[in-house]
Amino acid sequence: MNINSDYIVIKALEDGVNVIGLTRGADTRFHHSEKLDKGEVLIAQFTEHTSAIKVRGKAYIQTRHGEIESEGKK
């Protein structure tokens, strides 16, 4: 694992925020998921296995490219 891989910070702004890691390769698959409650923070890293991270729910997301807030369910 390369410790210089990008990290992202995800802070849940509501209960039940799902964070899902997606795999690399010919077939994209879910390989890990976490459920966060309001105020909980997850620090995630892109690795040789993780090519994408999906956030479902209202959360604050910080990366080296900037900051964004995802929208909750309406």
UniProtKB/Swiss-Prot annotation:
Pfam families: TrpBP. Belongs to the MtrB family. Required for transcription attenuation control in the Trp operon. This trans-acting factor seems to recognize a 10 bases nucleotide sequence in the Trp leader transcript causing transcription termination. Binds the leader RNA only in presence of L-tryptophan. GO terms for molecular function: RNA binding. The gene is mtrB. One of its GO terms (biological process) is DNA-templated transcription termination. It comes from Geobacillus sp. (strain WCH70). The keyword Transcription regulation applies. It comes from the Bacteria. Keywords: RNA-binding, Transcription, Transcription regulation. Oligomer of 11 identical subunits arranged in doughnut-like structure. InterPro entries: MtrB (IPR000824), Trp_RNA-bd_attenuator-like_dom (IPR016031), Trp_RNA-bd_attenuator_dom (IPR023558). This is Transcription attenuation protein MtrB. Transmembrane segments: none annotated.
